[in-house]
Amino acid sequence: MSAFCIGSEMRGLTQIRGANNVFPTVVALKSLAAEVRVLLGADCQIGYAADWSEYFGYLPKDDSGDPFFHLDPLWSDDSIDFIGIDNYMPLSDWRDGPEHKDAHWPAIYDPAYLRSNIEGGEGYEWFYKSDAARAAQVRTPITDGAHDEAWVWRVKDIRNWWSAAG
């Protein structure tokens, strides 16, 4: 066996925060990775495949504004060889009819439109604060006034998340 994934898309578990901001499922996944390493040996690549909204960090809904890079201890563990991201991020915000914010593009399936939303669009340049905002297409820009690190808040900014990992 050349590779083994110890789990996938456990967002509901990996984001449970315990005492002292420890994430118990992440601790358990590190332990599991070490056990799998013993069983499968050094030649087998081991990883975890995070949900696209889980890989970069955890943003608690406690008004603190504090992000937690809760999976970093797993990603940096000696028993982990690869980071998997189950990547099905939004590629468009297309609406039926001619009256919507993306209507200036020729069509939902236009390659340039779709490309522009890989490192752009929802989850990169802007987000919706609520279901009502989504329905009305009230887009809130993603910024970071405190540290000029907007990538922290952009779920689609894999390039800068990875660059900051160093």
Report residues per predicted region.
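Noncatalytic carbohydrate-binding groove/subsite architecture in carbohydrate-active enzymes
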Residues: 1-2, 8-166
